[in-house]
């Protein structure tokens, strides 16, 4: 049987740099192939070639789809062939309805007049196909991210898709939304629709794939059956070396209590009747890694936003640092107390995309370079920037490059560099490795371990339970705004954490860390 897709010896250069070099990829109808590689490995470039974003003639090699060579000059050319790509940043218009988004650019008309009755009927069938029980007239901006992702798939199905490319589709989804999405991909597979799945979440890659293709430094490293590969096998192919332990387990000692929070309650910014955090108390020691686990909506981010002074609603409770009660109502007061935070959404809250990498790093510590006068000491600032880039291994062609052009992992390292310039005693990391590749994750994990060895206390909030369990000395489990468990991490399992989240009573382990 001929392949649905064959990409033969694809090479794409930018100036003298080969982004992809002689890469081959092929798949059958109904096959799910995961494309794996670190950020900057060439995955996105290869997909842009396939979709016509990089037009025929701008690359070397040949693309055969459904038995015909594709020579696309625009993404619309490949869409007409049945190839659709859904990016991590969804391409939906939030102010339009579900129906209007699905048919945008593909409206059904009769004599120049749009046939809304026929489009509504078609839209209802498409929504049913992706298991969405919503009205076609629903405004897309009112949907959750998981539902928006499914609307994107319905939009692709409306274009008679034969090959669906999903780029980091679950980066912002809950575990339940992820499960629904994977089930729908499997259902599409039964209808002969092929899928190229791009994700840094290797458990998903293993669960969904028939075949795994690995690219490293722009070159095709290998394609193997998913059933015969372990996560360690994938990592080794991706990074070119064996990571003996993803989570460094260097011994570190904890000191005295540095932080204590008592009876923290936070209300919804608009609806004062809704408690987002409900009577939460906990402590933190010097040199301790405290993980906070829970489902989306558990109140984890709201809790640490109160601690950092950026929760937009009202809250009450007591915060003690070094045994003394402190009042923190903004981030400047938090920083003055030795607290720094890497926010959950780095693109929205963590970086200024058009600003240089170096300026993003020094943004919160400009007082270090003024010497009591208003004029910046440019030489001192540049020296600090270069040292930070080297220390955190930020990969950038220049400190003056706009940070928005860096990979997610390197943006995150730059944000960490900014935090470390503040000389924090308490470092809060909210989803520290979301959407970044395995190599960058490993470097961040090593950095966290180095920081606690220096006595810095670290709070880690993560939706990935293996990450929480792999890093933490102790785990707080939250559910619906309440602290349900405070557990010493003596070989804790994911099942124990989820059981603690869902049980009715509060559970605390009294052992010392």
From Swiss-Prot:
It comes from the Bacteria. ATP binds at residues 37-44. One of its GO terms (molecular function) is ABC-type D-xylose transporter activity. PROSITE patterns: ABC_TRANSPORTER_1, ABC_TRANSPORTER_2, XYLG. The keyword Cell inner membrane applies. The complex is composed of two ATP-binding proteins (XylG), two transmembrane proteins (XylH) and a solute-binding protein (XylF). This is Xylose import ATP-binding protein XylG. The lineage of its organism: Bacteria, Pseudomonadati, Pseudomonadota, Gammaproteobacteria, Enterobacterales. The gene is xylG.
């Amino acid at each position: 049987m001929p392949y649905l897709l064959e990409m033969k010896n694809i090479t794409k250069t930018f100036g003298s740099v080969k982004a992809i070099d002689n890469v081959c990829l092929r798949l059958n109808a109904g096959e799910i192939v995961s494309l794996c590689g670190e950020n900057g490995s060439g995955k996105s470039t290869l997909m842009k070639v396939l979709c016509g974003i990089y037009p025929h003639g701008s690359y070397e090699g040949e693309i055969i789809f459904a038995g015909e060579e594709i020579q696309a000059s625009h993404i619309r050319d490949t869409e007409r062939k049945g190839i659709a790509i859904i990016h991590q940043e969804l391409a939906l218009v939030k102010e339009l309805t579900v129906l209007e988004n699905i048919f945008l650019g593909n409206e059904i008309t009769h004599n120049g007049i749009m046939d809304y009755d026929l489009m509504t009927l078609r839209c209802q069938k498409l929504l049913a196909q992706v298991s969405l029980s919503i009205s076609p007239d629903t405004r897309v901006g009112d949907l959750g991210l998981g539902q928006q992702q499914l609307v994107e798939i319905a939009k692709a199905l409306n274009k008679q898709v034969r090959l669906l490319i999903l780029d980091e589709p679950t980066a912002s989804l809950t575990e339940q939304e992820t499960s629904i999405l994977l089930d729908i991909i499997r259902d599409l597979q039964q209808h002969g629709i092929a899928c190229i799945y791009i994700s840094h979440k290797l458990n998903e890659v293993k669960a969904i794939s028939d075949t795994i293709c690995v690219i490293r430094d722009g070159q095709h490293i290998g394609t193997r059956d998913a059933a015969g590969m372990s996560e360690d096998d994938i990592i080794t192919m991706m990074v070119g070396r064996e990571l003996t332990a993803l989570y460094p387990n260097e011994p570190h000692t904890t000191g005295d209590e540095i932080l204590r929070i008592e009876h923290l309650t936070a209300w919804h910014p608009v609806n004062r009747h809704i408690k987002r955090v409900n009577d939460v108390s906990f402590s933190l020691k010097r040199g301790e890694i405290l993980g906070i686990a829970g489902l989306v909506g558990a109140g984890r981010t709201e809790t640490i936003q109160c601690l950092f002074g950026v929760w937009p609603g009202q809250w009450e409770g007591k915060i003690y640092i070094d045994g003394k009660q402190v009042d923190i109502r903004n981030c400047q007061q938090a920083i003055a107390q030795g607290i720094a935070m890497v926010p959950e959404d780095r693109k929205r809250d963590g970086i200024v995309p058009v600003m240089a990498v170096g300026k993003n790093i020094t943004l919160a510590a400009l007082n270090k370079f003024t010497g009591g006068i208003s004029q910046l000491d440019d030489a001192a600032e540049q020296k600090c920037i270069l040292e930070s880039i080297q220390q955190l291994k930020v990969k950038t062609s220049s400190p003056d490059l706009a940070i928005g052009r860096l990979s997610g992992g390197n943006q995150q390292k730059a944000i960490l560099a900014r935090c470390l310039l503040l000389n924090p005693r308490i470092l809060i990391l909210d989803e520290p490795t979301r959407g970044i590749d395995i190599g960058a994750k490993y470097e961040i994990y090593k950095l966290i371990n180095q920081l606690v060895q220096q006595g810095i206390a670290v709070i880690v909030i993560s939706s990935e339970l293996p990450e929480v369990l792999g890093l933490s000395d102790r785990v707080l489990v939250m559910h619906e705004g309440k602290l349900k468990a405070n557990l010493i991490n003596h070989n804790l399992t994911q099942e124990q954490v989820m059981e603690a989240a869902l049980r009715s009573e509060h559970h605390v382990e009294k052992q010392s860390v």
